[in-house]
Amino acid sequence: MIAFVGLGNPGKEYEKTRHNVGFMTIDELSKKWDIPLNQSKFHGQFGTGFVSGQKVLLVKPLTYMNLSGECVRPLMDYYDIPLEHLKVIYDDLDLPTGRIRLRTKGSAGGHNGIKSLIQHLGSPEFDRFRIGIGRPQNGMKVVDYVLGRFSEEEQPDIASAIQASVEACEAALTKPFLEVMNDFNKKV
């Protein structure tokens, strides 16, 4: 089984915010793959299905971003999913808005959701789909920025990035992740 986890914050007030691009991507995968997120356990909303011959788990932790590991670790244990089958989708301040970057492991890079996952999983060695949200301008606080919504000008770039992330997730079902990473990291 391959687990795709989108990071975000639960609740209407956080829908479509920069910090929730992981949730938005999981919602798109759910539609495209016809896997309803109709199960709830371990402080998460999730669904399972088969895509390209692979059993798939789609997850949206409902713990708030900074506690994502509290949902993901128990689900990984429950379904006996090895760390190399975990794919995490999240926002990244260090990438320009609309850009995606895949990587196989690394530090949290200041992202509290990733920090929680590393802490609870006991390892930073899991595949990541980073979606660029850019950096705040004009002295805006980071917390206000990530919890804000995309501007009208940013909407097309984010829609493209989410679509590219969906395509990368699909490719990761049938190709080695390093190959997928090389293919998608080249795209602008």
From Swiss-Prot:
One of its GO terms (biological process) is rescue of stalled ribosome. The keyword Chloroplast does not apply. Its EC number is 3.1.1.29. Keywords: Cytoplasm, Hydrolase, RNA-binding, tRNA-binding. PROSITE patterns: PEPT_TRNA_HYDROL_1 (PS01195), PEPT_TRNA_HYDROL_2 (PS01196). TRNA binds at Y14, Y64, N66, N112. The active site is at H19 (proton acceptor). NCBIfam families: pth. Monomer. This is Peptidyl-tRNA hydrolase. It comes from Bacillus pumilus (strain SAFR-032).
